[in-house]
Amino acid sequence: MTTPLDDPTRLPVHDVMCIDCKSFYASVEAIRRGIHPLAADIAVLSKGDSPGGLVLAASPNCKKRYHVGLSTRRFQLRDDMQVELAEPRMADYIRKNYGISRIYRQFTDDAHWYPYSIDESFIDVTHSHNLFGSNEEIATQIQKKVFDQFGIITTVGIGQNPLLAKLALDNEAKKSTPWQATWTYDRVPETIWKLADLDDFWSIGSRTAKKLNAIGIHNLYDLAHADRALLHQRFGVIGDAMYFHAWGIDYSDLTRRYLPQSENKGYGNSQVLMRDYTQPREIEVVLSEIADQVAGRLRHHQVQGEVISVGIGYADAEEADNSGFGAQMKVDPTNRTDDLIRAARFLFHSKWNGHAVRNVSVRVNRISQASTMQLSLFESAEKEEANVLLDQTIDKIRQLYGYKAIVRGYSKEKGATAIDRAGLVGGHHG
């Protein structure tokens, strides 16, 4: 039997590192308090004064001793847990991230550095060995520099492509010292195929795992030895990608950033609610506030969109038998707040089945330059012009004096969150 690994000339071979700042937010807070990150019992909690406040990060000790982790709620933290709660300081985390990224960039050029999230980055060091040594030597130098300058422990996954580097990071490097691991094509049977669950695999979610289970694929070995034609038939190009990923093959190139076409570029905001929202009016209010924020961003960039989408995440996903829903509609190109609110509310009511809501998002796609005003068949030109002027006036006031200087009436209703969230960085206090 031939396999995708049989012809090495067809395999992408680079020296890629996936670097993670271990429990980044919690580590920053530990260092602020003069505690070693591995010795601290700290949880960074958003909205700590609310029972529904979310844990954004927990120190390794906290995870191990109390099983506190990402998305643990405030009400789940018992009094007997000796956990120090810290308010997120996003502006400080961003500054630290910038400084740490500068260290990564000392070992490669910017084209081969790809920030994946605030605490995780990829770098390709294929052409850096003459200057800095082997993969392991480069990883060790990075770890030492970051720890010496910031006190942060970094873990490093090394692979011949981004997938292998990421899998090495998540499944081995993060678990024990020296916080490094290397996964290669020749180790696929002893690494990738030994992963216990499909949905633990990077790029396969729980829904896709269930669909794979339904056709007799229960682990990565099964996926690697499945009928590729069947995978393509069931999942399209995603099926092809999953098949190759199960063999450790990933053709991603860090130097080739995905630059979306203008019709695919979008603007959106999302929010995790601090409690279950069950009343339709309260959900409408939050949708309206988010739509207002998205419309403001569109106008700031002097663009408009013609596809509006809404995402709703349920609090009781198991009871509802699904995690929520998404819906979208095409409209005349617009960046008007009223248009986005009207569409968002319509889409919400078109699919909502009464289940409690915890996540809300609004997004606008198919973007074009806002060069002209689109006239409505249902409103007079005078009213259209007045609405445009109102939006522009609100934008100017907020630009000068901040978001809270002028808010729409619904932001004073029960369930509204925009006023409380105004001034936050990344949804949290700076």
Feature locations, PLM:
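Residues that scaffold, gate, or flank divalent-cation-dependent active/transport sites
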Residues: 1-118, 122
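DNA-contacting surface of Y-family translesion DNA polymerases
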Residues: 5, 9-11, 18, 208-356
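Short acidic, glycine/serine/threonine-rich loops at helix termini
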Residues: 28-31, 54-59, 164-172, 236, ...
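Short Gly/Ser/Thr- and Asp/Glu-enriched loop/turn motifs at secondary-structure junctions
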Residues: 116-120, 158-162, 303-307, 356-359
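Catalytic palm subdomain of template-directed nucleic-acid polymerases
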Residues: 123-143, 216
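Long, highly charged, low-complexity intrinsically disordered interaction regions
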Residues: 136-197
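Acidic, metal-coordinating catalytic segment for phosphate/diphosphate chemistry
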Residues: 324-430
